[in-house]
Curated annotation (Swiss-Prot):
Pfam families according to UniProt: SBP_bac_6 (PF13343)
Signal peptide interval: 1-36
Lineage: Bacteria, Bacillati, Cyanobacteriota, Cyanophyceae, Synechococcales
Organism: Synechococcus elongatus (strain ATCC 33912 / PCC 7942 / FACHB-805) (Anacystis nidulans R2)
Single GO term (MF): metal ion binding
Name used for this protein in its record: Iron deficiency-induced protein A
Length: 357
């Protein structure tokens, strides 16, 4: 596999100065815990956010453990791990979407951790946001919501994901393709909640309500909704946060035309997907790898995830990005993220039969 598909970076002690909010806790505690760990950790990451790099530098500063980062697309990183096999230098695999983490477990790429082996990880992450065998743990959350054009829709008209198949929304719904992992995971959760037959019927109704054939990512759906191409968009909340912060005045103006609705609040709650990480089964530096995961779930790192990319933190008590907080509080679905991937294949098949391209 071509090395040009990946980006390599190292984070050394004494790197770029960091925001003061990250330096509030004791260096000594992390130093003591690092004494039994190896001196470096090799990280394969499918996340591409500068704020993550800030966290890695801070980890190195606090522990003395060097982080060697390889960035790439998640599917390419999974293929690389499979190709490298027991020779892989990777210690930690990080990616967005629970479905991709499930793929890693199916390929036997990740090491299981018991609660006795990793009490801090089990304490930090709720059961529905981690693998039942401790092979991966959520690092951040992203809610997939209904966004609506405030000039065309009243919130009282909205209720559930299931209601999006109602004919009253004919030619009004904007959403990306069925092959997108976020839509696959949403549909996978609906299979778990409603059953495959009802979910397929829902998908058929949803397709009938498309404002246009799916095209582009979440941001184009939101912008099209603001422009009146449709009235509703299915998208992750952090994409709207980015538009509010855009350097382009027209994108900020578009964001102001959009409101967020959290579906299924009287039922199971709103679908929440994750970014997550696990220790590679053949990790040459397993103690350093576990310490990195524990740091990523510390209050300091969680605050950076929340503020830097507009994601929801996994750890309780961590402040949200002010724009994200402005969308309001909501009830989250407690359906295990592990089923999103388990239902991926079935989800794609029924979406295809429904005509969701």
């Amino acid at each position: 596999m071509s090395e040009s598909m990946f980006s390599r970076r190292d984070f050394l002690l004494g790197g770029t100065a960091l925001a003061g909010t990250l330096l509030l806790d004791s260096f000594g505690d992390w130093r003591r815990r690092a004494e039994a760990a190896e001196g470096e950790v090799n990280l394969y990451s499918g996340r591409h956010y500068n704020t993550d790099n800030q966290i890695y530098r801070e980890f190195t500063q606090k522990t003395g453990i060097k982080v060697n980062l390889i960035e790439g697309e998640a599917d390419a990183l999974l293929a690389r791990l499979k190709s490298e096999g027991s020779r892989s230098p990777a210690d930690v695999f990080i990616t967005v979407d629970a479905g991709r983490l499930w793929q890693a477990t199916q390929a036997n790429l990740l090491r299981p951790l018991t609660q006795a082996q990793a009490p801090k990880l089990y304490q930090a992450v709720p059961a529905n946001l981690r693998d039942p065998q401790g092979r991966w743990f959520a690092l951040s959350k992203r809610a997939r919501v209904i966004m609506y054009n405030r000039d065309r829709v009243n919130a009282s008209q909205l209720s559930t994901y299931e209601d999006l198949a109602n004919p009253k929304w004919r030619n009004q719904i904007l959403v990306r393709s069925s092959s997108n992992v976020y839509n696959l995971s949403l549909t996978g959760e609906m299979i778990a909640a409603d059953g495959a037959a009802k979910t397929e019927a829902w998908a058929r109704g949803l397709v009938q309500n498309f404002a246009r054939q799916p095209q582009g990512g979440d941001t184009p759906q939101i912008l099209a909704c603001a422009a009146g191409v449709g009235s509703l968009a299915i998208a992750n909340t952090y994409y709207l946060v980015r538009l509010f912060k855009s350097k382009k005045a027209e994108e900020r103006e578009a964001a102001r035309k959009i409101k967020v609705f959290f579906p299924n609040q009287k039922g199971r709650g709103t679908h929440v997907n994750i970014s997550g990480a696990g220790i590679v089964r053949t990790a040459p530096n397993p103690r350093a790898a576990q310490l990195l995961l524990e740091y990523l779930l510390s209050s300091q790192a969680q605050a950076v995830f929340a503020r830097g990319n507009g994601e929801y933190p996994v750890l309780r008590g961590v402040s949200l990005d002010p724009i994200l907080a402005g969308f309001g509080q909501f009830k989250e679905s407690k359906i295990s993220a592990s089923v999103f991937g388990a239902n991926n294949a079935q989800a794609l098949q029924l979406m295809d039969r429904a005509g969701w391209k």
